[in-house]
Amino acid sequence: MLLSIIIVNYNVRYFVEQCILSVARSKGIPLEEVEVFVVDNHSSDHSVSHLRHCFPASFPLRVEVIANRQNLGFGRANNQALHQVTGKYVLFLNPDTVLTEDTLHEVLQAAESHPEAGVFGVKMLQSDGSFAKESRRGLPTPWTAFCRMTGLGNLFPKTRLFGNYYMQFLDLTQFTPIDIVSGAFMLGEREKLLKMEGFDEDYFMYGEDIDLSYRLLQAGFHNFYVPTPILHYKGESTRKYTYRYVHVFYQAMFIFFKKHFHRSAIWLSVPIRLAILLKAFLSLIPLPFHAIRNYLNPASAHPSPHILYLGRSGTAVRELAARHGIHIDILDADATSLPEGHLTKGIDLKPYLIIAYDTADFPFRFILNRFETAPTGKRHIGLFHPDAQLLVTGKRIFT
């Protein structure tokens, strides 16, 4: 087996379905040499039965679903599958990602060319096509962490002194060594990952990727950034400014300092806890206003997006729109008839929040390239999968 892909799921069955469908579109590698292990952390949305139904033995990829009876957390669930997979390479992959047809081929080529490597990451794009800064990170030393927490890194993002956390001084288009690879897409040799004993299970949700990347560096390996794009919905699916997120994230950072920078952990404990309280306070300020707005205008809690659909399955899309009471304009097209996609001159994009591409008519690489060419922050990617009758956006899913 060439490649084993591990996906940890918790109540996001449609994202997992879409992710696996994108893997199955991979070119340049034999699909019979790829296996997918989904570790379900005791989801309540019928994920296990849904995924087993979607991906039977006849599916081009071997898909195994492990059903846990409790939520083991990210690291422990990944390790659970790591000890069962058989591939030469292992890819830890978030469920809210979409690969292009070339992603696996390009990263595996890099892996074969760099036996000195620990793990590889990729260029992650947010749903508006903009670059996700988490794609490349520097080692969070006490100084780097201080710059991030105080905002110095935001003031001087492209300097090595202050902006090392996100390494924005590096060229996005170049294959380059980095310190930290995101756990959303982390590929490495199985034997090396087993030697490192996988993820540290002291972390529950955040920080595991930082810890593993650092341990690989300490062991003499090098981590790399491969400038091939994937879609990652994290900006939409993770509430970064809730108290829970802030608390768990900074606690994970403190665990990292305590483990790897023990002397610094003592004097860092106070500012880290102050940062948690400050950011938690700032995250709570908007909540009463949102509650009042949603009470006075319940529709504002889940606004109906104005969608432009590009593809050949207009009838199915109209039926889906009618079921959900949403407005979708239809442009009958494919990649051949509309080579510039939604960027074609003459298409008025102003009314639309979502540009939904039909995945049967447009390659994933085509879609991501068009959004990456002109990200605006106003319009976001939608993906319609006609065989599954599934429309996925960052904030809502329509079936």
Report residues per predicted region.
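Short, well-formed alpha-helical segments that are part of the catalytic scaffolds
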Residues: I7, V12-K27, L320-A321, L343
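Short, acidic, metal-binding catalytic loop of nucleotide-sugar glycosyltransferases
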Residues: L21-E33, T373-A374
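A conserved acidic beta->alpha catalytic loop
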Residues: S22, D40-S49, Q70
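Short aromatic/hydrophobic "clamp" motif used to bind/position activated sugar donors
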Residues: V90
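Conserved donor NDP-sugar-binding/catalytic core segment of glycosyltransferases
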Residues: V98-E134
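Short, flexible, basic/aromatic active-site loop/helix in glycosyltransferases
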Residues: L139-I178
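A short, conserved alpha-helix in the catalytic core of glycosyltransferases
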Residues: D171-Q174, D179-P229
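Active-site-adjacent helix/loop segment of glycosyltransferases
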Residues: Y214-H290
